[in-house]
Regions:
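Non-heme Fe(II) oxygenase metal-center motifs and adjacent flexible, charged/small-residue loops
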Residues: 1-200
Length: 200
């Protein structure tokens, strides 16, 4: 209970997803369609070497170079910094700004799941332009993933717990997937100066 209280963000409580592990917030229309289109243009205009092909997705890494001793920080591009500032303004990181972004692209039929895939305890519907916030046990104790599918079928008897916030979550709906682009915005607490990384 104490962990849940520490993870709660009072200003986001209207967006809390009930009947789900604590604490999950789902904010529909967090960005506008115009902002979405702008971000997508910038993502797909990124230099080809910026993309890394992984199993079931493609990835861009912005904000720093991962290293066992810490992250070597890099300045975020202005087009991405605006979105990062908007998330940081929610006070998700103890008043500190986010400093790292992973951009993931999933084609229809692609996904990423833990191996072996566990029995899911909940499943959410994430619509375009929305923001999903995982805190507390939902972030520290549970794995999360995206099922590799081309169509998502909503069970009328068991709708996703955030269905009330999703205009496409009609009972029995068949939702055909398009290309999915997601931004994982986070704060990496341990960063290094380049000189420290190179020192003995």
């Amino acid at each position: 209970m104490e962990e849940e209280q520490d993870a709660s963000i009072p200003a986001l409580e209207p967006f809390r997803v009930e009947q789900a592990p604590p604490v999950i917030y789902y904010i529909p229309d967090f960005i506008s369609k115009e902002e979405e289109e702008y971000l997508l243009r910038q993502v797909f205009n990124a230099p080809k070497p910026k993309w890394t092909q992984l199993s079931g997705r493609k990835l861009q890494n912005w904000g720093g170079l991962p290293h066992p001793r810490g992250m070597v920080p890099e300045r975020l591009p202005p087009w991405l910094q605006r979105c990062v500032d908007k998330v940081s303004d929610l006070s998700l990181f103890g008043g500190l700004p986010a400093n790292h972004v992973l951009v993931n692209q999933y084609l229809p039929g692609e996904g990423i799941m833990p191996r072996p895939p566990p029995q899911p305890i909940t499943s959410l519907l994430l619509e375009p332009c929305s923001l999903l916030v995982l805190r507390g046990a939902a972030y520290t104790r549970h794995l999360h993933g995206i099922a590799a599918a081309r169509v998502d079928e909503l069970d009328p008897a068991s709708p996703p717990p955030n269905a009330a916030a999703c205009c496409s979550a009609l009972p029995g709906a068949r939702l055909v997937r398009g290309t999915r682009v997601s931004l994982t915005i986070r704060r990496v607490p341990r960063v290094l100066r380049a000189g420290l990384l190179l020192s003995k």
